[in-house]
Amino acid sequence: MKNFTCQCCGQCCKWEGFVIAKEDEMAAAAKLLGITLDEFIQKYTKLSQDRKSLIFADRADGACVFLSDDNRCKIYEARPWQCRTFPHEWDVPPDMQKLCPGHRLAERADATAAEALPLIHVLGHPALPMDITNAPGDAQVLNCHNFCLMLSLLGLPYIYYGCPGSKLPPGGAFVDCGKPIGKWSYRNKWHQIYNKRLSKHLAKCARLDGKPEIIASIYGAAQSDIETFGLPVIEAMVGYDHCWAPYRVFPSYAHQHTIYAQQPDFTAKNRFFDTVIPHFLDDTQYWPSSNPQDYLLFIGRDAPGKGLAVAQQAAEKTGLELKVVHNGCFGAAKTELLANARAVLMPTLYVEPFGYVAIEAQMCGTPIITTDWGAFAETVLHGLTGFRCRTQAEFVAAIRKTPQLDRNFIRDYALNHFSIKKIAPKYKAYFDFVWNVHKNGGYYADAAFRDATFL
């Protein structure tokens, strides 16, 4: 519960039940008490009735051993997750939940806060279900997933309009737009049918009650012919070669400038309301290696613009193995491959809008070697988290110098700049900004600030 604050009534610590003692939680509590884990186990735990696990001991009156006389927890800062989430995330009867005054207060506060939360209508992938396990190489499926995961983290209600088989993060509702009748291309038959379906579903799901409500387009022109019903449309995570909505979020200034140059007349109408927010990743899916190996890695599509030939030539000059992965690598296997590499090569020849692989590598603490243009100028710290190169001599020298870089610093940089937890508040601020300018005068709206820097 977002607004839960313990009222120190002691009710939950006196209820019949038991707290399972997990090793990491016992270790944290032992550290707080200034004793060893073994001492903690001996003094404060006992075997469960089925003798399969340790549970926290009880006082003589049946209350938790850590409950003080003034109804406070002696290990509150290190209390187990089981205690942190009781009773509001447990399968507890409502009449027992009502015994917790903190829970009752939080329910009222959460209900009040929910009234002000924007409802986000997420227009997803027009041809593939949102399932990153089945489409690990599709950047737009990843964008859809990450965007919804971010909304879930922010606690924002959302509705995802997508293909059958989509797997949503918690907190969202799913609207099935039906199976695609073919591949999408601009204004083809599937485009027209798809936009009609979207409009029909939006008509049913939109609140249109004056409360904050936003449409988020995650697939560009595929959704450009929808009926918006007067709601503001944000084109979020614009990494493709066009734009159509009045509010746009670019992943880099490099890509923003590219689109402004390609569509000068269209973007001039409302570029005052655009913003730049980097793409982001769930950092829990990436970890460093304690013993990295001495191979180089290239992950990317088998396309000339990805610069594979540049990577191969540079690797050959150094005599190091270059592992090449074009698709099918996902999850823990991908993270291990990234984390154990000496360096990841990403010599993209075109102006890269963002480049997820560069961020994935850095989240693993692995140096990234790129070309010196596009988004890399904004995502790679030259000489610190990797190298940005223009000649073969520079690529070769970069490969040889990567062992000198601090892999802990590289990972910390990525976590602080591209993790979902760091980026989510930027999107929330932009949602508030868009609703404000949409409802209150556009450019001249009071307090039309995209972020807290102006406050």
Feature names for model-found ranges:
Residues 1-116:
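Short loop/turn segments that flank or connect secondary-structure elements
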